[in-house]
Amino acid sequence: MSEAGDTSPQPGKTGQPKAGDRRRARALAMQGLYQRHFSKTPISDIEAEFMVDNDMSKVDIMYFRDLLRGVHREQAELDKLLEPFLDRPLKEVDPVELAIVRLGAYELKHRIDVPYKVVINEGIEMAKRFGGTEGHKFVNSILDKLSRRLRLAETRPR
């Protein structure tokens, strides 16, 4: 088992994970969180299912596991961070967009190795791909505001 934040290369791979591998890890983690929202299947079962049912050869597996497990483990805390920035009750947020902003909140809080602009951009791109027509605007707004709270030194104008 890996620890949260472990980004060591996967067996058979050398060096740092590629951006595309992390992008795919984020997308799969978001889909796993979405599935969990509806099925209440244990997160370990969802992780195992995704590992079997998807081509993981171009996925940063450690990052996928960190995101999936971390967001699940800290969901209540992440929701408390997000709620002040929401324009509606949490239960009314589209499940895809909710999974994306939870994922982004986790990355902003725990993955300091990922620049806040990357976290926001990746969230926007996932919302465009998987969310509703205007979902990317919602995701952008929430993650931008949250980044100013969690990454003050990084977001402060110079």
Swiss-Prot record:
Q: Matching Pfam families, A to Z?
A: NusB (PF01029)
A cellular component term from Gene Ontology for this protein is:
cytosol
Reading the lineage from the top rank, the first entry is Bacteria
- Entry's Gene Ontology BP terms: DNA-templated transcription termination; transcription antitermination
Return the Polar residues bias intervals.
Answer: 1-13
Entry's Gene Ontology molecular function annotations: RNA binding
Keywords carried by this UniProt record: RNA-binding, Transcription, Transcription antitermination, Transcription regulation
UniProt function note: Involved in transcription antitermination. Required for transcription of ribosomal RNA (rRNA) genes. Binds specifically to the boxA antiterminator sequence of the ribosomal RNA (rrn) operons.
User: Per its record, how is this protein called by name?
Assistant: Transcription antitermination protein NusB
Upper lineage is: Bacteria, Pseudomonadati, Pseudomonadota, Gammaproteobacteria, Pseudomonadales
Q: Which gene encodes it?
A: nusB
